[in-house]
Amino acid sequence: MRKIIVGSRRSQLAMTQTKWVIEQLKQAGATNEFEIKEIVTKGDQIVDVQLSKVGGKGLFVKEIQQQMLDGDIDFAVHSMKDVPAELPEELYISCMPKRVDARDVLICENGYTFETLPKGSIVGTSSLRRGAQILAARPDLEIQWIRGNIDTRLKKLDSENYNAILLAKAGLERMGWTDRVDFEALDPDVMVPAVGQGVLAIESRKDDAEVTTVLQLLHDDVTAKAATAERTFLKAIEGSCHVPVGGYATVNGDDVTLTGLIASVDGKEVLRVTKTSTDGVALGQAVAEELLGRGGREILASVNE
């Protein structure tokens, strides 16, 4: 029986996610031996700069993908929102386990909520998308950039001058920390999530049939349908971490409903389009085209200047 080498970033969340996938595969009947290989990515080494200023998406996956191409690892577990829309020709997302909660959460000091945070409160986030949507709804708040893993950010809320921070609920869930902090989950109507938020993307080589067969034990078709619509949208607008873009799809029977968002960094311009279709790929493209045609192209051009 072949030993399968799994690549993972060293962060606590990445290792937790990778171990979870291996455990789920074993429970689903995989009899292979698994070994985790820790890989340091460029994104892990840059901790004091806003991600959008150093290359955006791909910062957390390129080194891992290279080891897969070199045959040093057999598959890798990513957070889908870290994975660029374009993948190397020889690799693909071969498995998407069932999605967890895709919403963003606001964690405030002193029991405040999004509605009651006092004017001038400082909200920490690492995401242009989150910052823009916060300012669109509450222009009286101030956004400051914050980096680091979930634990680091929670400590910064206690020790530094942030009044609130924004995180993905999926990260809290996967770390088992939903009871550790009081949080307010923001409805996607208020805060459109990042494309692929709450989805694990398992990437492997297209020519490795054995690994593909093992990974299919965990694949969830509903999750894949939603994520495909979201990622098609992202690819069609050529989105990256440089721009405030959100995309969130839900599946009801054969229907996929996708909301796409493009915003200016200051939140003064926010464009949102929601459409439903049975074809996720066509849907992603249609939402992108409408947003770009309604002024999204100009917003993206101004953000990228």
From Swiss-Prot:
Show the Gene3D superfamilies listed in the entry.
Answer: Periplasmic binding protein-like II, Porphobilinogen deaminase, C-terminal domain
Primary enzyme class: transferase
* Lineage: superkingdom: Bacteria
Q: Which keywords, in A-to-Z order, does the entry hold?
A: Porphyrin biosynthesis, Transferase
Q: Quickly give the catalysed reaction.
A: 4 porphobilinogen + H2O = hydroxymethylbilane + 4 NH4(+)
Cofactor binding note? Binds 1 dipyrromethane group covalently.
Cofactor names from the entry are:
dipyrromethane
Single Gene Ontology BP term? protoporphyrinogen IX biosynthetic process
Q: What residue intervals traverse the membrane?
A: none
Q: Provide the positions where the record notes the PTM S-(dipyrrolylmethanemethyl)cysteine.
A: C241
GO cellular component terms given for this protein = cytoplasm
User: Its pathway?
Assistant: Porphyrin-containing compound metabolism; protoporphyrin-IX biosynthesis; coproporphyrinogen-III from 5-aminolevulinate: step 2/4
State the Pfam families in the record: Porphobil_deam, Porphobil_deamC
Q: Which InterPro entries match?
A: HemC, Porphobilin_deaminase_cofac_BS, Porphobilin_deaminase_N, Porphobilinogen_deaminase_C, Porphobilinogen_deaminase_C_sf
Q: Name one GO molecular function term.
A: hydroxymethylbilane synthase activity
EC number(s) per entry: 2.5.1.61
Its signal peptide is: none
User: What does this protein do, in the record's words?
Assistant: Tetrapolymerization of the monopyrrole PBG into the hydroxymethylbilane pre-uroporphyrinogen in several discrete steps.
Give the UniProt family note: Belongs to the HMBS family.
The record's listing under NCBIfam families reads: hemC (TIGR00212)
State the oligomer form and interacting partners: Monomer.
Report further notes: The porphobilinogen subunits are added to the dipyrromethane group.
What's the protein called, per UniProt?
Answer: Porphobilinogen deaminase
